[in-house]
Amino acid sequence: MTSWTEFAQQAPELAAFGQARFQTGVAYLATVRADGGPRVHPVTPIIGQQLFLFMEPTSPKGKDLQRDGRYTLHCAVEDSGGGGGEFYVRGRATLTGDPALREQAVRAASYVPEEQYILFVLTVEFAFMNQYVAGGRNSRRWQAGE
């Protein structure tokens, strides 16, 4: 399991691109429902030493992640031409009650998380980016352990 910091050390350009894309606003979190089907949710990722997500304790996405921690997180794309590019990561999410991690996430957040929000730490197992340029695209990928 790879933290965001470890990912950034191994693939600094890819991590910097991903951080920039996630900071532009809403991203989309895919989880696995209890019946095995996919579920997609808008979220605001937080990047500090770890990749974090806060959410309401009653959120369906939180229930999904507590039952099956697999996730994929994809940045919003600005337009049908690909805008600033695409970035996504996949890995495992773990619910944490650690006060030090919560403090870290609150400090890194672009908003003030509500006290009742639960916190997930997301590992990075795979990352991929596409930048669309005149005449083609620039793609990169990274996988933990490669």
Language model region names:
Residues M1-E13, G81-E146:
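Charged, gly/pro-rich active-site loop segments
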Residues F22, P38-V40, G82, E115:
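Short, solvent-exposed coil/turn segments
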Residues R21, L65, A105-R107:
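A generic structural signal for nonpolar/aromatic side chains embedded in well-ordered alpha-helices
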Residues T24-P57, L65, Y71-V77:
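Short beta-strand segments
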Residues T2-D35:
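Short, conserved active-site entrance elements at the starts or edges of catalytic domains
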